[in-house]
Amino acid sequence: MYGGTSVFQGNQTTHGMSDIYPVAQLYWSDRDRNHFMAYVMGGLPQGTYNSNNLANIGIGHGAIDVGGAYTYTNRKTYWEASATAGVTNNFMNNVTQYKSGVDSHLDWAISKGLSRELSVGIAGYVYYQLTADTGSGNTVGANKSRVLGIGPEVGYLFTRGDAQMPMTYLNVRAYKESWAQNRVQGTAVFAVLTLRWGQNNIHTFTPEKSVK
């Protein structure tokens, strides 16, 4: 909705390739419970995009995102909490001559490990646009958008061999969106598959050993 007028209406399903997001990350931690990360990520508009569609997988323009993250883990209780916050600067969409404003985003999750392999929890996100859209293709004025989502998450660690070496981690999240303004609202489902590469890329809970 904008100015009391519905800009888009209806439902649409879209399939295709996503954009490419190269990222540089820096991690550090106290090797126990507190873990930190800073990142810079670019957005390359290679995904499926059509300016006439209501739903698109690609965003149709380049972008650069900077931010950081914090994760707390407790190996005794199997609780984990994490949050990632960032700010994104969007570049001009050359198809529509429309430039989205600078936006902010927060993603968070709290989970409980039921076993070494299985964890369940709740996750959510908030998207809030800080500056209005611009460009010669902007026909709706000082447009700013927002949305939030919240829902369940499930994680499972696949292991191999008698030593139960962690090999693959699957995380599935489902979000019910609300608070939407100048943005589509619905239900979003994400599945992330992490493959082992090296020794320490997959975090697992292991019981702490007492020192005598």
Language-model regions: role of each:
Residues 1-101, 141-145, 198:
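Outer-membrane pore/translocation modules
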Residues 94-212:
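Outer membrane beta-barrel transmembrane domains
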